Amino acid sequence: MDIRAAEISAILKDQIKNFGQEAEVSEVGQVLSVGDGIARVYGLDNVQAGEMVEFPGGIRGMALNLEADNVGVVIFGSDRDIKEGDTVKRTGAIVDVPVGPELLGRVVDALGNPIDGKGPINAKQRSRVDIKAPGIIPRKSVHEPMSTGLKAIDALIPVGRGQRELVIGDRQTGKTAIILDTILNQKAIHDNGPEGDKLYCVYVAIGQKRSTVAQFVKVLEERGALQYSIIVAATASDPAPMQYLAPFAGCAMGEYFRDNGKHALIGYDDLSKQAVAYRQMSLLLRRPPGREAYPGDVFYLHSRLLERAAKLNDDNGAGSLTALPVIETQGNDVSAFIPTNVISITDGQIFLETDLFYQGIRPAVNVGLSVSRVGSSAQIKAMKQVAGSIKGELAQYREMAAFAQFGSDLDAATQRLLNRGARLTELLKQPQFSPLKTEEQVAVIFAGVNGYLDKLPVNQVGKFEQGLLSYLRSEGKAVLDTIRTEKAISDDTKAKLKTAIDSFSKSFA
């Protein structure tokens, strides 16, 4: 056998030269302890804050506490299969989710994995869940209406595109119903409106019952609204880290539309449960507790999330992301820690009350305590014209109604005020799943403000409204179309509208 030393040395040299180029370096650590959805890991020295790490069996986690001798990792999933001594791998990636139009019509979890059984989502883009909000320069003040389809809100507490409007109230006061009706109200625009007016909807369910989320999805599906919506669900049985992450994941999905010159709406239902999940994680990570045992940065948790809802200026595509965060109060206590935090972050609040709800005033909006800090710049001119006086009249009515309980002999002017107020309150009631177009709301409120309801018994107001709407949809279609296109009520339109309501009033008996 002939051994060629030169040849062998050439092969060895070549192997030595290329040695280590394909070697994949993956930094690993070891689990020191695990429990309550938190793992303490030793050895991930270069891990980044918020980085995704991988446990055996494909379970993912997120590094939150970077300490001198170990890393505190929250686990996205069950910690039952993780034991002391398991190896943990860095992924090198900060937590991200799929984004884009491919997610429309789907139900996903907080990491963007589909949970609706409709197959995989082939999204072309991914985005980090926790991005910095747009600065001051790329923004523009809110000036386009975001129509909810609810008279009480669109007339009195208008919400604009790019605004953050808090929906706050006790349990069972119809908070989710407001978000649901707002999503359903976008269907008409999606069916036959221009692309620039379409509003894509993201609904984030945090810590809710699975049956509730399933019911929500079913309603959207039956009414054809799921096609322009994304549902992100972290239900009550999901681990706390998923409930903490879900709003950020939903926000990243909404931001895709905002940054591409489109309009999106996101509802967080509800942020109280996210704060509770965050408190649980923080206490288990042994971070110092503050007021009500919430960690010191719980304000920052919500402010950095809600600041991402914005209206961008024309140079940045003129897109918008509107946020409707929900907060659940306990016994109407708006001065608790989380409610006051979120009230101070948002641009106004819609305050719902149990008493109003049980009196049959639904949506149960307390018009006195609710406010929109964007105000009438988020309304079309026609709505400003008719709804301008209604808030004042209702405020006077509430004040007088309190006095009227004591005295029986009221002068005619006070009596008129009370009559008008009772009828306007009745007019603002609206059944669920029946949002109205803006021009229809304008016509109905016009009738109320101009005294057409004053002679009717209060219990006939709803019937009058339904009759008037069906009459206008058939006979007065031209007037409604004019209001929609001109977005204002000229003297000519006003005369036509009065004529239409007059002719209907004669036939209504």
UniProtKB/Swiss-Prot annotation:
ATP binds at residues 169-176. Its main location: membrane. Disulfide bonds: none annotated. Gene3D superfamilies: 2.40.30.20, ATP synthase alpha/beta chain, C-terminal domain, P-loop containing nucleotide triphosphate hydrolases. It comes from the Bacteria. It is a peripheral membrane protein. GO terms for cellular component: plasma membrane; proton-transporting ATP synthase complex. It is found in: Cell inner membrane. Its EC number is 7.1.2.2. Coiled coil: none annotated. InterPro entries: ATP_synth_asu-like_sf, ATP_synth_asu_C, ATP_synth_asu_C_sf, ATP_synth_F1_a_nt-bd_dom, ATP_synth_F1_asu, ATPase_a/bsu_AS, ATPase_F1/V1/A1_a/bsu_N, ATPase_F1/V1/A1_a/bsu_N_sf. Keywords: ATP synthesis, ATP-binding, Cell inner membrane, Cell membrane, CF(1), Hydrogen ion transport, Ion transport, Membrane, Nucleotide-binding, Translocase, Transport. The record marks 370 as: Required for activity. One of its GO terms (molecular function) is proton-transporting ATP synthase activity, rotational mechanism. Belongs to the ATPase alpha/beta chains family. Produces ATP from ADP in the presence of a proton gradient across the membrane. The alpha chain is a regulatory subunit. F-type ATPases have 2 components, CF(1) - the catalytic core - and CF(0) - the membrane proton channel. CF(1) has five subunits: alpha(3), beta(3), gamma(1), delta(1), epsilon(1). CF(0) has three main subunits: a(1), b(2) and c(9-12). The alpha and beta chains form an alternating ring which encloses part of the gamma chain. CF(1) is attached to CF(0) by a central stalk formed by the gamma and epsilon chains, while a peripheral stalk is formed by the delta and b chains. This is ATP synthase subunit alpha. It comes from Sinorhizobium fredii (strain NBRC 101917 / NGR234). The gene is atpA.
